């Protein structure tokens, strides 16, 4: 209660467009949709004096964890965020009031340099979108980005490799300049996190902060020719896809038509094929697997966090969630069950 208004930090993490509609498939009732935006608009007004309080959290990680490409994740996330801008301004709010209450969550994968470039491109494109509405303050064009390590490339077999993936992903996000970061425990995909796995996840971030000092350098990747070229390339491709979505009625229209899901699910199928053909490498799964390892006994169904999607009757089609190594793991688990 005594916290200064400029210092109070709260994230409501409300996201009826992506999190509720893409994961649960509940976009069947227009009345519910209107009520959601009415509630969000009231929260934006109520927290207007609290600069660091965020109301909307645009969950772009949802697309990445369903197997989308980096370009699709960025374009669809920005399109959903634009939908929030439009819907909330229709409620009488200004661009400055709305934009400053939006936070983004992106997944960060093991594509080290591409992930750095993705966050840099995201900030550039979001600034362009907000600028088009003539905000009165430049700070309204600033993107607040949260990163969470990927679930797509986590594996059940050789799970300690997940520690390496998480560290690499955390490093990409830190160098890219995210505002906050979540490193998932290495056993996230097959059991409820243990004290050990949670401690390792926390310490990965602390090492990057206290030993590598990534929090003390502004844009360490800035000026790198390779990263700058990647940034421009990703920005151009994402902007093109963003405009295609907008030209066809916007994110909600494309979601209800099933076009967003179709694109993301197709990318997921292609990536599974790439893993099967070893064009996309998963160490310990399709490259250098330990065939003496067994995993059946360590899978805790109650604690499993596989991001299984579900659709609801009358709603839109939900995204299909899976992990890159799931098909390999299914074969090995079936072999274990057979006792051979």
Predicted regions and their residues:
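Intrinsic disorder at enzyme termini
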Residues: 179, 240-340
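Catalytic alpha/beta active-site cores
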Residues: 1-109, 133, 142-146, 174, ...
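Active-site proximal loops enriched in glycine and acidic residues that flank catalytic Cys/His/Asp
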Residues: 60, 106-108, 147-149, 184-187, ...
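Short glycine/threonine-rich loop-to-helix capping motif typified by GTGT followed
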Residues: 68-74, 109-121, 150-163, 191-201, ...
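Phosphate/diphosphate-binding loops
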Residues: 1-3, 14, 27-45, 158-164, ...
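Flexible loop/turn segments at secondary-structure boundaries
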Residues: 17-22, 62-68, 91, 95, ...
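Mobile "lid/hinge" segments at catalytic clefts and subdomain interfaces of large enzymes
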Residues: 43-44, 48-87, 167-242
């Amino acid at each position: 209660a005594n916290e200064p208004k400029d210092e109070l930090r709260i994230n409501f993490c409300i996201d009826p467009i992506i999190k509720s509609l893409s994961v649960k498939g509940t976009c069947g009732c227009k009345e519910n949709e209107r009520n959601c935006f009415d509630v969000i608009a009231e929260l934006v007004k109520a927290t207007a004096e609290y600069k660091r309080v965020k109301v909307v959290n645009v969950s772009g990680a949802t697309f990445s964890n369903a197997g989308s490409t980096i370009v699709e994740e960025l374009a669809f996330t920005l399109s959903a965020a634009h939908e929030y801008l439009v819907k909330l301004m229709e409620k009488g709010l200004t661009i400055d009031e709305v934009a400053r209450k939006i936070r983004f969550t992106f997944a960060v994968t093991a594509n080290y340099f591409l992930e750095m470039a993705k966050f840099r491109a995201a900030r550039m494109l979001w600034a362009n979108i907000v600028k088009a509405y003539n905000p009165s303050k430049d700070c309204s064009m600033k993107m607040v980005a949260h990163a969470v390590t990927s679930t797509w490339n986590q594996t059940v077999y050789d799970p300690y490799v997940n520690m390496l993936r998480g560290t690499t992903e955390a490093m990409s996000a830190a160098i890219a300049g995210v505002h906050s970061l979540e490193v998932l425990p290495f056993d996230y995909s097959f059991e409820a996190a243990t004290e050990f796995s949670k401690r390792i996840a926390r310490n990965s971030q602390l090492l990057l902060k206290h030993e590598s000092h990534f929090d003390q350098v502004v844009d360490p990747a800035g000026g790198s020719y390779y990263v700058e070229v990647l940034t421009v390339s990703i920005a151009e491709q994402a902007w093109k896809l963003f405009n295609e979505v907008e030209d066809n009625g916007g994110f909600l229209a494309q979601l209800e038509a099933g076009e967003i899901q179709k694109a993301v699910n197709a990318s997921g199928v292609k990536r599974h094929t790439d893993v099967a053909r070893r064009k996309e490498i998963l160490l310990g799964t399709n490259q250098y697997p330990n065939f003496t390892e067994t995993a059946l006994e360590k899978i805790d169904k109650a604690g499993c966090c596989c991001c299984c999607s579900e659709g609801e009757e009358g709603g839109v089609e939900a995204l299909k969630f899976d992990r890159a190594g799931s098909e390999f793991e299914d074969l090995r688990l079936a072999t274990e069950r057979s006792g051979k």
